[in-house]
């Protein structure tokens, strides 16, 4: 009987260790997960982020290249996007809305490297820029 209890205990320990090892290979629940930046959904979110940045600007910025994307599942989804920007051809005026199709880059020179976190709750039609920060390209 003692042998049987020892064998059952040993099997339980092995199964627990195997389950723990497989969990460690998966993304941490609530942690950031790296995504493929070539997905058009992420590029659209980056354009959304730049469209909200109008204070103190005469022209909208526009996205040149999406560099990195991470997602985090919360009570919705947080998207952390890192991208390069430059000034666009669209002047910020009352009634003029940003569009990635219309607001083309004035030049292809990178003016800033920006990181933005966008919070979405698709089933409630919520989309908000939580943070937006840019650095000069040589500071990154």
UniProtKB/Swiss-Prot annotation:
GO function terms (MF aspect): cysteine-type endopeptidase inhibitor activity
Induction profile: Up-regulated following blood feeding.
Domain of life: Eukaryota
Keywords from the named record: Disulfide bond, Protease inhibitor, Secreted, Signal, Thiol protease inhibitor
Keyword Secreted: yes
Family as reported in the entry's similarity comment: Belongs to the cystatin family.
General function of this protein: Inhibitor of cysteine proteinases. Inhibits several endogenous midgut digestive cysteine proteases, such as cathepsin L1, L3, B and C, but not aspartic protease cathepsin D1 and cysteine protease legumain. Inhibits proteolysis of blood proteins catalyzed by tick gut cysteine cathepsins. Inhibits host cathepsin B (CSTB), C (CTSC), H (CTSH), K (CTSK), L (CTSL) and S (CTSS).
Name the record gives this protein: Mialostatin
């Amino acid at each position: 009987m003692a042998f049987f209890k020892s064998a059952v205990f040993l099997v339980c320990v092995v199964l627990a260790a195997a389950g723990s090892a497989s969990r460690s290979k998966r993304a941490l629940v609530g942690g950031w997960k790296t995504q493929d930046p070539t997905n058009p959904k992420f590029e659209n979110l980056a354009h959304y982020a730049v469209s909200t940045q109008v204070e103190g600007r005469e022209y909208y910025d526009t996205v040149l290249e999406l560099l990195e994307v991470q997602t985090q599942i919360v009570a919705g989804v947080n998207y952390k996007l890192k991208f390069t920007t430059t000034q666009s051809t669209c002047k910020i005026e009352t009634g003029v809305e940003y569009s990635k199709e219309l607001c083309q880059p004035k030049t292809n020179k990178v003016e800033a490297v920006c990181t933005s976190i966008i919070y979405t709750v698709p089933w409630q039609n919520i989309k908000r820029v939580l943070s937006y920060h840019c650095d000069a390209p040589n500071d990154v």
